[in-house]
Amino acid sequence: MIVMKFGGSSVADATCMREVAALVAEALPEAPLVVLSATARTTDTLFEAARKAEQGDLGAALALHRGLLQRHRGIAGELFPDGLPEELDNALVELGGELDLLLRGVALLKELSPRSMDAIASIGERLSTRIVAALLGAPWVDARTVMRTDDQFGAAQPQTREVAALADRLLRPLLGTDRAVVTQGYIGANARGLTTTLGRGGSDYSAALFGAALGARDIQIWTDVEGVLTCDPRVVPEAQPIPELSFAEAAELAAFGAKVLHPATIQPAVEAGIPVTVRHTRVPHGRFTTIAAEVHSGRPITALASRGPVTVLTVTSANMLNQSGFLASLFQVFAQHRISVDLIATAEVSVSLTVDADAPLEDLLADLSAFATVGIARDRTIVAIVGEQLKLTPGVTGRCFGALRDINVEMISMGANEINLSFVVKEEDAKAALQALHPVLEAGLDPDGGRP
């Protein structure tokens, strides 16, 4: 069997859903499990409606609710011009009623808990999958019966052993030649049956977990680009699809801002040894990227990525000199405040680290000031150079920084696996940095014409 995951842009309207149905029909001999996101913009609309309700503006929240349901009924009406199947019509009515009750509850309490937000957010995937399942005439499975998670609403962690057992019991019997099964990405439920979500972009993660649990031959991520590109095409129009990526390269790119894959997607596939392919819904037989355990591209640099804004914290203390355990104490403070660190660079008496720009720093800084002084640089961007051959190619880092000679690099960090060289620049310099580096990657030439 295979897993076919389609993102929001791939199920945005009736035309897109027909294209998805055609792709699934072509893959029926491979017993596809179809995993869908909400239709484009739906999750954002649900979040906005929830915030309006929390603010006490129930009228605005319900107006967004009506617009959302009307849009989905319009899509369904285009797909079924002679009338909606009774099961689909009933499902849309039920989901509309559920959303209405949830929004009214939030407005009444003027409180939007993560638990309530997850319940509201789940409506999007349940709407899109109901319509596509009806279009395909396929069984519809509520992912919440299979995707068992912990209680961390908004960013729930799947309980992989339970997911595997539930998938084997509830999904596998439905799979068979010439039949698809439709379920949702992004959503799950805890042990008490309360709805959870895996965080924004979590549909990819769902697809990988389902694929690993069922021993899929291939996990296909269908999106609106021809695979993973060498760089963000909005920044570098010359960016090209990458035919093959290693699991390690893909994980680094996802972690450092490549938008095609959710960062957590790769691990279940790695553990199960299942290739992941990233394909274009509108160009199904065009170029695509295969992500596998081993690849042999021969390129010193495979791709570039960036992530920002981030904040750089420089922690300085004379206690670092000749003292063991300083870094352990430092990171214990970050752990206590549940703040993740992306990059780290050390000197004799200082450590520079990057954290997300929206990380809550006030209490962290108060604790750090007990044993160090802390400098803060905001509005920075991490630029990452990723490639399996990076560590094996003499001089490539020199050529990269030669390309950046007109850009001030504030921090440098080499990944422990030596396939990721990252550096920090001011946010306004990130675009120029990527555009300067891409010719080194794409043509194998530095800006002055020298060969790597």
Language-model features, listed with the residues they occupy:
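Short, mixed-charge, low-aromatic patches
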Residues: 3, 85-94, 126, 162-166, ...
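Acidic carboxylate-rich catalytic motifs and surrounding loops in phosphoryl-/glycosyl-chemistry enzymes
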Residues: 144, 279-282
